[in-house]
Amino acid sequence: MKITTWNVNGLRAALRKGFSEHLQQIAPDVILLQEVRARPDQLPDGWAAPKDWHVTWHPAVKPGYAGTAVWSRRPHKVLARGLEDGIDDDEGRVLRVQTDDPQGKPVRVASVYLPSGSSSDARQQSKEAWMKRFAPFAEGLRRARTPTLIGGDLNIAHTERDLYYAKSNQKQSGFLPHEREWFGTLLDTGWHDLVREHASDVDGPYSWWSNRGQARAKDRGWRIDYLLGNAAAGKRFKSATTHRDAGLACSDHAPVSIDLY
């Protein structure tokens, strides 16, 4: 079973840049989208309910901003929107569903778009408040006996292997010491960073690149798009792939996939 996460940086723009063709090449059973930036009724004809997919959208209230979605080849059931703590998810940042693998066994996935704090101190404060709320949410998912995955743009590079220019970004949002510590705590509780487990101790594979300079062409990026698995998912983990070419073509993020036995 292949599960893919992709921050598309605006689905309408990605569709014009070859999203459909790259999706066919990747051929996931489930795709988790972030930064959709559109309501279904704003998409080109046929894309609100694309053929051969079961689709749930979770757009932001603010037009053209954030938003998540889950597409699956087999029917899925929506389990929740948001962090399930009584606070409205007006920015459409979390969508959680349950679907089945090809053998008919249940698998749970959450498409997550953690806020960025890079634009201002206020946005960083908002990000950190969101992180505090996310930790207990993630712990609840981790305990499930059903294979469960959190996939998405988490806007944090965990270690120096996850960021090309690590030394010069020590004080930048996304690589702050307390953000990295927070991420490490998630892993310490029992979440598996499946891409890192597959890549071992190599640098990257990066999943986001700045548009400045030659960062994209020279693969000088950040690894901030993750697929985290609980213990049940970790036992079934087979392999991981970062689709750099698709990222360069359609978005500033690469799609990232994992395969489960």
Question: Model-derived features: where do they sit?
Answer:
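N-terminal, active-site-proximal structural segment of metallo-dependent hydrolase catalytic domains
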Residues: 1-49, 54, 60-66, 158
